[in-house]
Amino acid sequence: MAVDNLKKILETWDDNKDNSSEEFWHKFFEENSVILGQVFSIPVTILGSKAYVGGKKLDNKGGKYPDYLMIYKQTRNTALIEIKTPKTQLLSSEYRSEVYTISREISGAISQLLTYRDKFLKDYYSLVHNSSDTERFYASNPQCILIAGNAKQELCDSDKKQSFELCRSNSQGVQIVTYDKVFEKVHTLVNLLEGK
């Protein structure tokens, strides 16, 4: 049964690789949270979808809402996930010979996630003030993850791959994961469960 569900998830991915609706992907990940778990090395669950993490001013504006607030099951520490779409451009045009810059969409999403984390850390105590011990969560340097783009489709030559990997590995505080890599992990899980 579990393998069949994972195969349906992979079918949806195959049918929607070109789907540029962020709302579609948000709903899909929320309904199939096992997918989001593939980007972590330890078990997690969704604590909140579009959860308020702080930032409101006196006029009740400016609140910050990442796509997902995740919680590590054992430690109850948190992580923030922001999603874009598989069609989100990873790189801009060639900057110099053999060098590409990260796209405006990716750099903007990184700034967005870091702002969410900053507000979350500043407002943490007011957010958990009335929580019981069983409801309490922690914000000990919460991990930030951005899911965007499709490396297999976009990074078609070694210069683009190298530029992206250099930008990704030097992105302080935000882990960038492409959609194709997330679903590759689901595919690997299916193979393991089927004994392949």
Role assignments for model-derived ranges:
Residues 1-196:
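Charged, terminal alpha-helix-loop-beta segments
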